[in-house]
Amino acid sequence: GWRDWLNKGKEWLKKKGPGMVKAALAAATQ
């Protein structure tokens, strides 16, 4: 279900991309 997908996404972000998260947030706020 979508919860499983969301959890996988969270784990991926923890491993791959604090910087990517920051960049996405910066882009979203512009």
From Swiss-Prot:
Expressed by the venom gland. GO terms for biological process: defense response to bacterium; defense response to fungus; killing of cells of another organism. Its main location: secreted. Keywords: Antibiotic, Antimicrobial, Fungicide, Secreted, Toxin. It is found in: Secreted. Shows a broad spectrum of activity against both Gram-positive and Gram-negative bacteria. Also has antimicrobial activity against S.cerevisiae. Has insecticidal and non-hemolytic activity. This is U1-poneritoxin-Ni3a.
